[in-house]
């Protein structure tokens, strides 16, 4: 499963939800029509819903879910993350990664395990990996100046700059 977006607000009177795309690629959302998705809240609450319509207007994305027909119903879903099956995830180009899939990867340098990716977050136009080293946590910018090879088979991420873990 992959996170594809977050519900931001209701839109109109018919129960549409305005959604922020995690990938900023709206085209892939068209494939969600007539498919079930999971809406997850960070408190662990999960709802399975069917997407019945996808609408893109003025650089904004709107989804309509089966059985959710009023703005009030959508308001209770604000902040929920939209999770989709792997088969509905956006396609990736060479060198692109689903950040959620990097959770659990080992951070290595010279084949020495230093820590583990436990989370990630986006701030402005930057992505940071949260890495646990022993009992400490560090944030590593997800940039090629700091991050080297990512090995999906070995589930490792090379750290080029060790000073980021001090």
Curated annotation (Swiss-Prot):
SUPFAM superfamilies: PRC-barrel domain, Translation proteins
GO molecular function annotations of the record: ribosome binding
Localization of this protein: Cytoplasm
UniProt-listed InterPro entries: PRC-brl_dom, PRC_barrel-like_sf, RimM, RimM_N, RimM_N_sf, Transl_B-barrel_sf
Assigned keywords, A-Z: Chaperone, Cytoplasm, Ribosome biogenesis, rRNA processing
GO cellular component: cytoplasm; ribosome
Domain (PRC barrel): residue spans on this chain: 94-165
A family per Pfam: RimM
GO biological process, one term: ribosomal small subunit biogenesis
Lineage: superkingdom: Bacteria
Domain writeup: The PRC barrel domain binds ribosomal protein uS19.
Family as reported in the entry's similarity comment: Belongs to the RimM family.
HAMAP family in alphabetical order: Ribosome_mat_RimM
Function field: An accessory protein needed during the final step in the assembly of 30S ribosomal subunit, possibly for assembly of the head region. Essential for efficient processing of 16S rRNA. May be needed both before and after RbfA during the maturation of 16S rRNA. It has affinity for free ribosomal 30S subunits but not for 70S ribosomes.
Subunit: Binds ribosomal protein uS19.
Protein name: Ribosome maturation factor RimM
Species whose genome carries this gene: Borrelia garinii subsp. bavariensis (strain ATCC BAA-2496 / DSM 23469 / PBi)
């Amino acid at each position: 499963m992959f996170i594809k977006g977050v519900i931001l607000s209701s839109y109109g009177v018919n129960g549409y939800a305005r959604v922020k795309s995690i990938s900023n690629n709206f085209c892939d959302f068209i494939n969600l029509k007539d498919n079930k998705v999971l809406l997850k809240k960070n408190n662990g609450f999960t709802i399975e819903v069917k997407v019945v319509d996808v609408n893109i207007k003025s650089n904004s994305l709107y989804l309509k879910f089966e059985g959710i027909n009023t703005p009030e119903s959508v308001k209770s879903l604000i902040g929920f993350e939209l999770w989709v099956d792997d088969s509905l995830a956006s396609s990736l180009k060479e060198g692109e990664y689903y950040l959620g899939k990097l959770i659990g990867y080992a951070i290595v340098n010279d084949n020495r395990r230093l820590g583990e990716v436990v989370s990630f977050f986006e701030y402005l136009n930057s992505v940071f990996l949260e890495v646990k080293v022993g009992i400490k946590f560090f944030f590593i910018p997800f940039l090629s100046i700091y991050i080297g090879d990512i090995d999906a088979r070995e589930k490792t991420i090379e750290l080029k700059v060790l000073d980021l873990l001090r």
